[in-house]
């Protein structure tokens, strides 16, 4: 029995090493201002500063959870699916599940962004655990028409969530260029995958999706760094326009996006997981507020917070710092509870600033 257990353990270790050390084969794409066919990797037109002090930063995150995690469960509500699905034409509705996972009801279609429902967003699953369960599980969701994924990092692309959604029906995946290789490996048929390069668009059932630049990176293993692209997205239907930020540091691409779209109904912009140790990977709170103002939305909703601690700041620090500045710049924030059905006109409270009950 002991030998059998050792053999099983050895097999598991070998499988994990094979996954990490042997990369998937990606197509070679045409050369561009953000892709090098010689190295078969994407890059940022504006170079990133290399992260520093990662070991110490992540060790503090792991060993001092009181500094980064809420002391009590965050308030949530169970989604009212009847209200969500009854979104009238021109009045899209949304549900936030924490971090960057949003369910959108637009033009009679249901769209989910960066679906991550798992307990951990780390390749080492005992780390970076979710603060609490999502307000609903995947099995409780209404049928999903489109799955929109910005990039391949674990907190935006989760194998279990992808496979669970894929098994529920005929959802179509719209993803950044290069991500199809992994999705097909996980069982998603080629005909249900659309990959987009920056500034490319696709239309499904009257909804237009456009991949937009971001300043970030991608990887899941030791050997696949930047083999898939990272993007933000514009989503347009009728007279409505929404912006889903994904992950991105500050850059000149924001100017181009603002000029191209001339305002949005709601911008969903990352507001969390920043650090001086990785200054060119995420927006700092002041940058989030200024970028939100630059995009001229009716409402700005901070995302990329509320579910996982992946940086050294307190769980609510991003909002406490960004929202006062956003308001001073004329931006109207939107801060629903996780699970709450909301739209561009929903009145919300700064619940994150109050003591947790």
Cite the ranges covered by each PLM segment.
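Conserved G/P- and acidic residue-centered "switch" motifs that form tight phosphate/ATP-binding loops
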Residues: 114, 151, 247
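Catalytic core of the metallo-beta-lactamase
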Residues: 101-105, 203-263, 279, 283-287
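Cap/insert and terminal regions of metallo-dependent hydrolase folds
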Residues: 22-29, 35-37, 146, 153, ...
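Acidic/histidine-rich helix-loop elements
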Residues: 115-134, 217-224, 275-281, 309
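Metallo-beta-lactamase
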Residues: 2-122, 126, 134-137, 177-244, 321-341, 345-346, ...
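Active-site metal-binding motif and surrounding structural segment of the metallo-beta-lactamase
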Residues: 126-174, 262-268
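Short hydrophobic/aromatic-enriched beta-strand-loop microsegments
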Residues: 113-114, 173-174, 190-199, 265-270
């Amino acid at each position: 029995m002991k030998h059998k257990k050792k053999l099983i353990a050895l097999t598991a270790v070998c499988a994990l090493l094979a996954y990490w050390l042997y990369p998937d084969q990606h197509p070679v794409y045409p050369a561009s201002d953000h892709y090098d066919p010689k190295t078969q990797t994407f890059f940022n037109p504006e170079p990133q500063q290399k992260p520093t002090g990662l070991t110490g930063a992540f060790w503090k995150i792991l060993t001092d959870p009181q500094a980064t995690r809420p002391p009590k469960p965050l308030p949530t509500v169970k989604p009212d699916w009847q209200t969500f699905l009854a979104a009238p034409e021109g009045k899209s509705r949304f549900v936030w599940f924490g971090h960057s996972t949003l369910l959108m009801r637009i033009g009679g279609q249901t769209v989910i962004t960066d679906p991550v429902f798992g307990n951990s967003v780390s390749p080492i699953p005992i780390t970076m655990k979710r603060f609490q369960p999502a307000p609903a599980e995947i099995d409780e969701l209404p049928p999903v028409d489109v799955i929109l994924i910005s990039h391949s990092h674990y907190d935006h692309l989760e194998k279990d969530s992808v496979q669970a959604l894929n098994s529920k029906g005929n959802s179509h995946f719209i993803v950044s260029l290069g991500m199809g290789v992994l999705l097909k490996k996980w069982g998603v048929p080629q005909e249900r995958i659309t990959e987009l390069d920056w500034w490319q668009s696709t239309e499904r059932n009257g909804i237009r999706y456009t991949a937009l630049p971001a300043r970030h990176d991608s990887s899941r293993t030791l050997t696949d760094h930047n083999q898939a692209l990272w993007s933000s997205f514009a989503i347009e239907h009728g007279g409505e326009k929404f912006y889903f930020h994904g992950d991105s540091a500050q850059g000149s691409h924001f100017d181009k996006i603002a000029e191209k779209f001339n305002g949005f109904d709601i911008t969903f912009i990352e507001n969390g997981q920043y650090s001086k140790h990785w200054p060119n990977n995420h927006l700092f709170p002041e940058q989030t507020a200024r970028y939100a103002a630059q995009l001229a939305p009716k409402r700005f909703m901070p995302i990329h917070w509320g579910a996982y601690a992946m940086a050294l700041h307190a769980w609510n620090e991003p909002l406490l710092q960004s929202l006062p500045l956003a308001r001073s710049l004329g931006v109207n924030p939107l801060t629903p509870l996780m699970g709450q059905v909301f739209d561009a006109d929903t009145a919300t409270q700064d619940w994150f600033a109050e003591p947790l009950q």
